[in-house]
Amino acid sequence: GYNLIMKLPYKTISDSLNRSRFSIILANPQNQENIGLVARAMKNTGFSELRLVGLQEFEQEAYRPAVHARDILKKAIFCQNLPEAVADLNLVLASTARQRKAFQVITIDQAVEKIRLFPSHIKVGLVFGNERTGLSDIELRQANFVYFIPQSSRQPSYNLAAAVLITLYTLFRQSAPELVAELPPPLPHKEQAGCLQIISAK
């Protein structure tokens, strides 16, 4: 009962989502360290394919924060533009930090639900924009869905790596099997109070 989560094999949770069909796409990233942190976030959540638009190679600054995720950087795919980066994908979702008049913007949870509506074998791309300017309207038109991550009005945008991590974790969390634990019925409240008195007296 209480120890159900401890008894459930880790593999059952982490392998419930076919991550190989997902591509994480960074459009014109500005900061090399952020790229390394994105790779680390991908490694933490089990995703492996990274595509980059507007870059031709990595600098050393990208490898330092990647730690054990350097293999993701070494296998990264470099693309000249966003249409090239998404050409082979069936479903594309793009992240934005603000509301856009030209687009219907949904929440990250709604975005994950959209993904789950489609067959589990299709190829999915998650697109993140430049740290300073985000994605342009032209770039957003490449997406089937545009989503945002709720945030405080005091700090209206997430760091690139944080946005990627939250997105991937949301996918991870919503794809895990539901754990239904049948707990033993609690004692009547009067008996609970009596037990607490006995424990306190020891």
Task: Enumerate the predicted regions with their spans.
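Post-transcriptional modification and biogenesis factors for structured RNAs
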Residues: G1-K202
